[in-house]
UniProtKB/Swiss-Prot annotation:
Location of region: A: 1-336
A single MF term (Gene Ontology): unfolded protein binding
General function of this protein: Molecular chaperone. Has ATPase activity.
Database matches in InterPro entries: HATPase_C_sf, Heat_shock_protein_90_CS, HSP90_C, Hsp90_fam, Hsp90_N, Ribosomal_Su5_D2-typ_SF
NCBIfam families the UniProt entry points to: PRK05218.1 (NF003555)
Keyword field: ATP-binding, Chaperone, Cytoplasm, Nucleotide-binding, Stress response
A Gene Ontology BP annotation from the UniProt entry: response to heat
Record has Chaperone as a keyword: yes
Name of the featured protein: Chaperone protein HtpG
Organism: Salmonella typhimurium (strain LT2 / SGSC1412 / ATCC 700720)
Gene responsible for this protein: htpG
GO CC annotations on file: cytosol
Protein location: Cytoplasm
UniProt keyword annotation of Ubl conjugation present: no
Gene3D superfamilies: 3.30.230.80, 3.40.50.11260, Heat shock protein 90, C-terminal domain (1.20.120.790), Histidine kinase-like ATPase, C-terminal domain (3.30.565.10)
Length: 624
């Protein structure tokens, strides 16, 4: 063969092949689904390119995929007359994985085969799945519009290398031949192959045909029998489509091995005409947080495939949604640039966003357990919503879930509607605290009075929470209030102070002034508080002051952070505060005040500028 060369696989491909053969073997029949799915994609791409260049059809516009096998040679062949590939494309698509972050992801995978098989499925392993059942795979392909002599041959045993060469191929498209391993004879059985295709590929809009051989007059006559419905699933009536068909179609378009959590299939007529089929996955893709992660919907215009990953139809905080939209209002020659500035696109985006939020609301209402699965996988992404989509903020807020003092669990199961339904008589605000961890939030001294009064506090410990709460200012007419900020509504919750206590506090005014003088501009203010029950002192910030958690976010992002000026609040009923107030020796007084401030700062920030000084001071006071 001309131009023959042997090349090594990209290292990630070798790792993926090894993991896949071992992890997916228990579900090995999916290789046929994957290869037929790829053939369908190749047909979609040809249809799209032929819109502007009909000559690409080369006189054969009836697109199909054909499956045949040879029992003597023990081969199974899947052939399509789709867009095909040239030599460079063969090397790019069959020798490398073009996903950033793949290497580190593969290295992190463990020995949990069930989990591994789900994660591997997210790569859209497609072609490589052939090696689950084959010890050698041969590919013959030619790109649509190329000369017959520009065909390409590719072959590999799925180990370290592959061979590529030039061949003559008269018909366009791709033909993949699997040389089956010993023990895989089931895939040479006509009935078995038919049943797999019916199970996994009935929804494919492309006709899938299987070879029929009949003996007539001593000769073998070959014909092709269509064995799938070959009608685009989303164009069919919802009442005719089974759940299994929706599930398999999801796996086809999302290249996922797991069933989706839920879906919504809608046909809209009137001002705008479109069909949408939207899915919520049951598992986050491994690269969801990767900057290069591709997301978006498949776009069809009048049932003609236009593009994958059309992100213009979904806001970023819903980037986990998979599915498609088939519009009658967009032009067939639409580009990503046209989509960006199109009124039709904006209207579709608005309608589809509402549809997804309604779908999630229904899931939360009908199946709390499934919704918890969704929340664990995608809750952090949904939390971007309040900042990104003010118009739908109330709908997004209903979908948020939090840990809370009511449940006494780190599980984020409490909705804002739950919280409001449990608010105490006269309670006007929704109280929350942000912290680095659930434990830090739960044990914060800021909660002491609220706990005593039985008032629920939402415990927020995800990094995004502080940023989200800057935009989420109210729900159901109730304002959100951080308990780490100075607020009169919290002070009002304290028990009425009797006259004797008032006199005692009045007597402490010189003490407060003495502390102010000592600390100077290191704090914004010093005051007595009734919001503490067990703790001697805390620090809080004013409503307009940057919070501790926000300062940490800025610092983690490498941005300059203005110094947070705290209000130093002292518990007049605490023995340590009383002892400090009674201390006459100035040096000793200073040590006590510094210790109380350091304790408060440590509880608030989790760190101290000089922890050794704090330890020295504490040890000294313990023995004094």
């Amino acid at each position: 063969m001309k131009g023959q060369e042997t090349r090594g696989f990209q290292s990630e491909v070798k790792q993926l092949l090894h993991l896949m053969i071992h992890s997916l073997y228990s579900n090995k029949e999916i290789f046929l689904r994957e290869l037929i799915s790829n053939a369908s994609d190749a047909a979609d791409k040809l249809r799209f390119r032929a819109l502007s260049n009909p000559d690409l059809y080369e006189g054969d516009g009836e697109l199909r995929v054909r499956v045949s096998f040879d029992k003597d040679k023990r081969t199974l062949t899947i052939a399509d007359n789709g867009v095909g590939m040239n030599r460079d494309e063969v090397i790019d698509h069959l020798g490398t994985i073009a996903k950033s972050g793949t290497k580190s992801f593969l290295e992190s995978m463990g020995s949990d085969q069930a989990k591994d098989s789900q994660l591997i499925g997210q790569f859209g392993v497609g072609f490589y799945s052939a090696f689950i059942v084959a010890d050698k795979v041969t590919v013959r392909t030619r790109a649509a519009g190329d000369k017959p002599e520009n065909g390409v041959f590719w072959e590999s045993a799925g180990e370290g290398e592959y061979t590529v060469a030039d061949i003559t191929k008269n018909d366009r498209g791709t033909e993949i031949t699997l040389h089956l391993r010993e023990g895989e004879d089931e895939f040479l059985d006509d009935w078995r192959v038919r049943s797999i295709i019916s199970k996994y590929s009935d929804h494919i809009a492309l006709p899938v045909e299987i070879e029929k051989r009949e003996e007539k007059d001593g000769e073998t006559v070959i014909s092709w029998e269509k064995i799938n419905k070959a009608q685009a699933l989303w164009t069919r009536n919802k009442s005719e489509i089974k759940d299994d068909e929706y599930n398999e179609f999801y796996k086809h378009i999302a290249h996922d091995f797991t069933d989706p959590l839920t879906w919504s299939h809608n046909r809209v007529e009137g001002k705008q005409e479109y069909t949408s089929l939207l899915y919520i996955p049951s598992q986050a893709p491994w690269d969801l947080w990767n900057r290069d992660h591709k997301h978006g919907l498949k776009l069809y215009v009048q049932r003609v495939f236009i593009m994958d990953d059309a992100e213009q139809f979904m806001p970023n905080y819903l980037r986990f949604v998979r599915g498609l939209i088939d519009s009658n209002d967009l032009p067939l020659n639409v580009s990503r640039e046209i989509l960006q500035d199109s009124t039709v696109t904006r209207n579709l985006r608005s309608a589809l966003t509402k549809r997804v939020l309604q779908m999630l609301e229904k899931l939360a209402k009908d199946d709390a357990e499934k919704y918890q699965t969704f929340w664990k996988q995608f809750g952090l992404v949904l939390k971007e919503g309040p900042a990104e989509d003010h118009a739908n903020q109330e709908a997004i807020a209903k979908l948020l879930r939090f840990a809370s003092t009511h449940t006494d669990s780190s599980a984020q199961t409490v909705s804002l509607e739950d919280y409001v339904s449990r608010m105490k008589e006269g309670q006007e605000k929704i109280y929350y605290i942000t912290a680095d961890s659930y434990a830090a939030a739960k044990n914060s001294p800021h909660l002491e009075l609220l706990r005593k009064k039985g008032i629920e506090v939402l415990l927020l410990s995800d990094r995004i929470d502080e940023w989200m709460m800057n935009y989420l200012t109210e729900f159901d007419g109730k304002a959100f209030q951080s308990v780490a900020k100075a607020d009169e509504s919290i002070e009002k919750l304290a028990d009425e102070v009797d006259e004797n206590a008032k006199e005692a506090e009045k007597a402490l005014e010189p003490f407060v002034e003495r502390v102010k003088t000592l600390l100077g501009d290191r704090v914004k203010d010093v005051r007595l508080t009734h919001r503490l029950t067990d703790t001697p002192a805390i620090v809080t910030t004013d409503a307009d002051e940057m919070s501790t958690q926000m300062a940490k976010l800025f610092a983690a992002a490498g941005q300059s952070v203005p110094e947070v000026k705290y209000i130093f609040e002292l518990n007049p009923d605490h023995v340590l505060v009383k002892r400090t107030a009674d201390t006459k020796d100035e040096a000793q007084f200073k040590e006590w005040v510094e210790l109380l401030l350091d304790q408060a700062l440590f509880a608030e920030r989790g760190t101290l500028e000089d922890p050794n000084q704090f330890i020295r001071r504490m040890n000294q006071l313990l023995v004094s």
